[in-house]
């Protein structure tokens, strides 16, 4: 058996532990065949990844489920309990009565009895069956922050999700959610990287004991919707060269040192190893100060979730001015 890396864990406010580095299963188009995707996820398991992040909108739940089943059946992993599986509710199911059925469907496709973490993907709602990312004014519906969270709490109470959380929530939206919640979100999965350091959201979530996970530690470098603002940043390039590390490792280590966890995605097995070689060294105060000086700009505005006559009309409304 190949030598596996060991990834530290963080304890969430739910009492459950989550590996600091997760493997992301959102893959760029064109989607690889099921067998190829399953093999990639199995490679990640062989490397030592146990935290896998998926979503109903990714179209990768089946391949992930097959990889997990194969890993268990082959003896590579002892049991389902060794995995931390997170999944996200898509916006067409972001309504009180649709959430439990959506979770059950994800469980069925994944072939598991429970999720370790279930999150609301976006604080947005569209009509059921609306064409993904090609929404018209009629597709957008009002999103009930407190009502959707009540249904998420029910998922937790039924034991179908050990922890529940949100994704892409601002300070203002979290504040509204917390006004009526009985179970606080364990995680807020957001865009966070050296080019968007979440200087408003991060301290708020720390104060409320809500853990931040970055879904964009490298800003999706190399794919159509991505950006070079992290991987081609001269500050990171200089730090990486001086430490004998890669730019990616410096970017990932910075997130870890902020007390956040991160989701990485690569089909390259060498880079799977590289992305978790971040725990036995640290950044100096001078290096952290240099990173703090990097100009800040949110990379993803989410304009596909806005309409001039819809519930959300602008980036300012979606992110409550935190741009």
Curated annotation (Swiss-Prot):
Substrate binds at residue 121. Component of iboga and aspidosperma monoterpenoid indole alkaloids (MIAs, e.g. tabersonine and catharanthine) biosynthesis pathway from 19E-geissoschizine. Catalyzes the second oxidation step of the unstable intermediate product resulting from the reaction triggered by the geissoschizine oxidase (GO) in the stemmadenine biosynthesis process from 19E-geissoschizine. It comes from Catharanthus roseus (Madagascar periwinkle). InterPro entries: AKR (IPR020471), AKR4A/B (IPR044497), Aldo/ket_reductase_CS (IPR018170), NADP_OxRdtase_dom (IPR023210), NADP_OxRdtase_dom_sf (IPR036812). The keyword Oxidoreductase applies. Pathway: Alkaloid biosynthesis. This is Protein REDOX 2. Disruption phenotype: Reduced accumulation of catharanthine and vindoline, but accumulation of 16S- and 16R-deshydroxymethylstemmadenine (16S/16R-DHS) and, to some extent, of akuammicine. Pfam families: Aldo_ket_red.
